[in-house]
Curated annotation (Swiss-Prot):
Coiled-coil stretches noted in the UniProt entry, renumbered to this chain: none
Identification of the protein by name: Cilia- and flagella-associated protein 298-B
Taxon lineage: Eukaryota, Metazoa, Chordata, Craniata, Vertebrata
GO cellular component, one term: cytoskeleton
Record-stated family: Belongs to the CFAP298 family.
Annotated keywords: Cell projection, Cilium, Cytoplasm, Cytoskeleton
Location(s) in or outside the cell: Cytoplasm; Cytoplasm, Cytoskeleton, Cilium basal body
GO annotation, biological process: regulation of cilium movement
Superkingdom of source: Eukaryota
Gene inactivation effect: Morpholino knockdown of the protein results in loss of cilia-driven fluid flow along the anterior-posterior axis. Multiciliated cells show loss of coordinated cilium polarity with many cilia pointing towards the anterior instead of the posterior. The planar cell polarity (PCP) component prickle2 is uniformly distributed around the cell margin, instead of being asymmetrically localized to the posterior of the cell.
Family matches, as InterPro entries: CFAP298
Main subcellular location: cytoplasm
Cytoplasm as UniProt keyword: yes
Functional note: Plays a role in motile cilium function, possibly by acting on outer dynein arm assembly. Seems to be important for initiation rather than maintenance of cilium motility. Required for correct positioning of the cilium at the apical cell surface, suggesting an additional role in the planar cell polarity (PCP) pathway. May suppress canonical Wnt signaling activity.
Length: 273
């Protein structure tokens, strides 16, 4: 299997395994779906954190119907987005634990651990979040709640920073080695037929131009190189200081040397043999 390290810009996103015979068209669809799915989970978790702290969005006719299991605890939302009737501590922990598990499943740290992310993992994380919300809110959330809208794919991200991060599949491009992978080609047309190939692929929105090339050395390698040069510089400084004071160990610099010679005790050793 060919391993693709997916990035957007210089930021690592996830690892993805595929085959050299896969059409680029299918590859674009798969990678874009995973990328957007990860963004969706991040948005849901962000809203769920607010839900766990401050309950539903503002006071409306749904407040009496959508009551969290086990009752609520009033916790005022300082920014005024939610009504402040938060779930109790046990239900709050259900939401928080599920959020942690879902985010860990699709975390960017998976790439550091050499674990690939699949569309099934994205769906699993989404289902976990949906299940946790159903446990805490068995009557469901209001139709206008951002979390429910995300689950139903009715979210409105127009004019938001989150909306700028999303890449619609028709506008999605994949780049490798400064070249756009054309949808009519196969991956093997670019990387050859070696199934053990590992490459860095960058996802980009159409019209934004070619993404920047990868640096010759990674940030970690650059950090280690700078540390090496720093240590070497400190060693050279120490050697210079040692050379400056090395004459103090010379015989001619010993102020008592002449006195010992006159007394005839210059070569006497005091340590037992």
């Amino acid at each position: 299997m060919v391993r693709l390290h997916i990035k957007r810009g210089d930021e690592s996103q996830f690892l993805f395994d595929t085959s050299v015979i896969v059409p680029v068209e299918a590859l674009v669809k798969q990678i874009t779906a995973i990328y957007n799915g990860i963004l969706k989970i991040d948005r849901i978790c962000s809203e769920m954190a607010e839900l766990a702290e401050h309950d539903l969005k503002l006071k409306d006719e749904w407040e009496e119907r959508c009551v969290p299991s086990g009752g609520s605890v009033f916790k005022k939302d300082e920014i005024g987005r939610r009504n402040g009737h938060a779930p109790n501590d046990s239900m709050k922990k259900v939401l928080q634990k599920t959020m942690e598990e879902a985010k860990a499943l699709i975390s960017k740290k998976q790439a550091e651990a050499n674990v690939c992310v699949t569309l099934e993992m994205v769906k699993e994380a989404t289902d976990q979040l949906r299940g946790a919300v159903m446990i805490v809110y068995p009557m469901g959330l209001p139709p206008h709640d951002p979390i429910r809208m995300e689950f139903e794919n009715n979210e409105d991200l127009s004019g938001t920073h989150a909306g700028q991060l999303v890449i619609q599949e028709p506008e999605s491009q994949l780049w490798w080695a400064g070249k756009e992978l054309q949808r009519k080609q196969k991956l093997s047309d670019y990387v050859g037929k070696n199934e053990k190939t590992k490459i860095i692929v960058k996802i980009q929105k159409r019209g934004q131009g070619a993404p920047g090339r990868e640096p010759v050395i990674s940030q970690e390698e650059q950090k280690n190189l700078m540390m090496h040069y720093y240590r070497r510089q400190e060693e050279l400084k120490k050697l210079e200081v040692d050379e400056d004071i090395s004459y103090l160990n010379a015989e001619w610099a010993d102020s008592n040397s002449l006195k010992r010679q006159f007394q005839g005790v210059n070569d006497i050793k005091w340590k037992p043999r």
